[in-house]
Amino acid sequence: WASQVSENRPVCKAIIQGKQFEGLVDTGADVSIIALNQWPKNWPKQKAVTGLVGVGTASEVYQSTEILHCLGPDNQESTVQPMITSIPLNLWGRDLLQQWGAEITMPAPLYSPTSQKIMTKMGYIPGKGLGKNEDGIKIPVEAKINQKREGIGYPF
């Protein structure tokens, strides 16, 4: 599972005890939280010993009485003992994200800062294609090695 940062929130699905849930990936949350209205009535819960900070004013905070089996978005095996409260959507916190091997990466730019400045001075607009109508290719051309040593640049 991968998600690029955009206007859309990064949500993914997880299967907890055989039931599918969708939740927001929240690297700022220590623990995962299931929305009270999505918690199955027949699953046991207890009043939480600790409160939750950062989710508004949660008056009723519960926690699962059991450690639950969970499958991540790419079927990663994990366990979770989620908190349960009245929130609009489920939150996948670092307790699950670590078990799923989640990473935050920022890829290095394709071109050096110097070449980016040169291209910008020449009128290049990032995300647009090259050419008069800015409709040319938008991704770099991949260099291929000519193993046969035939064609342009090689003698007949």
Swiss-Prot record:
GO MF entry, a single one: aspartic-type endopeptidase activity
Q: Where is the Peptidase A2 domain?
A: 21-96
Query: Into which family does the record put it?
Result: Belongs to the peptidase A2 family. HERV class-II K(HML-2) subfamily.
Domain of life per record: Eukaryota
For biological process, the GO terms are:
proteolysis; viral translational frameshifting
The protein's PTM annotation reads: Autoproteolytically processed at the N-terminus. Expected C-terminal autoprocessing not detected. The sequence shown is that of the processed Pro protein.
The family database entries (InterPro entries) matched by this protein are listed as: Aspartic_peptidase_AS, G_patch_dom, HERV-K_Pro_peptidase_A2, Peptidase_A2_cat, Peptidase_aspartic_dom_sf, Retropepsin-like_cat_dom, Retropepsins
Q: List the disulfide bonds.
A: none
Assembly description:
Active as a homodimer.
Give the EC number(s) listed in the UniProt record.
3.4.23.50
Active-site residues (renumbered) = D26
Q: What gene is this protein a product of?
A: ERVK-25
Instruction: Give all residue intervals belonging to the G-patch domain.
Output: 111-156
Q: Which organism is it from?
A: Homo sapiens
Which reactions appear under catalytic activity for this entry?
Processing at the authentic HIV-1 PR recognition site and release of the mature p17 matrix and the p24 capsid protein, as a result of the cleavage of the -SQNY-|-PIVQ- cleavage site
Q: Which UniProt keywords apply?
A: Aspartyl protease, Autocatalytic cleavage, ERV, Hydrolase, Protease, Transposable element
SUPFAM superfamilies for this protein:
Acid proteases
Reported function: Retroviral proteases have roles in processing of the primary translation products and the maturation of the viral particle. Endogenous Pro proteins may have kept, lost or modified their original function during evolution. This endogenous protein has retained most of the characteristics of retroviral proteases.
Protein's name in the database: Endogenous retrovirus group K member 25 Pro protein
Task: Supply the enzyme class, top level.
Answer: hydrolase
Task: List the CDD domains.
Answer: HIV_retropepsin_like
Keyword Protease present in the record's keywords: the answer is yes
Entry's PANTHER family?
A: GAG RETROVIRAL POLYPROTEIN, RT1 CLASS I, LOCUS CE15
